[in-house]
Amino acid sequence: MRAEQDRAFQEAADRDRVRMNETRERERQERQAREAQEKAKRDKEEAIEKRKAWRRYARKHLLPKSEGPIRVALRVPASSERNIRNFTAGPSTLPLFVYAETLLIPTSDTPDSDPDQPPIGFTPPYDFRIVTNYPRKEIELKEQGGEEVWATIKQAGGALFAEKKEDGTWGEAENGDSDDEEGDDY
């Protein structure tokens, strides 16, 4: 009978030990998941701040003067305004995409307070597309060979729309939405 009690006691102790180990492991996994979630949130906030700083830097240093024969009226999801600017056709369509990024700068951020250096280690994702109104054609971001794209813009009368890509974050901080609940696409 004593041996049976010892065996039952040992089995209960083993079950308790297994249960405690499982509880510890579950708590460790929950803690790691919570820490990973907090880190992802911090990283996202940091990326948003860097993007805002880059936009202001781009407005001051990368955006060409509004001159040239191609008049563009660009609408962005953040507002329904037609933002008009003139461009010179060239091999790159990058100025158009930089312009679209700078349209999301809040009016409270004046140009004289724009930074002289871009955020360290930040490369803009350009997670939006620019399309012509009619016929609907996507304007490609090209570093070279963009002359055809500028011709397409000119044929469309310069009426363009910018819209967020499927998994993009473009404009989220400005609109205050971190989910894609309201479809921002036009």
Protein language model regions, located:
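Ubiquitin-system adaptor modules
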Residues: M1-Y186
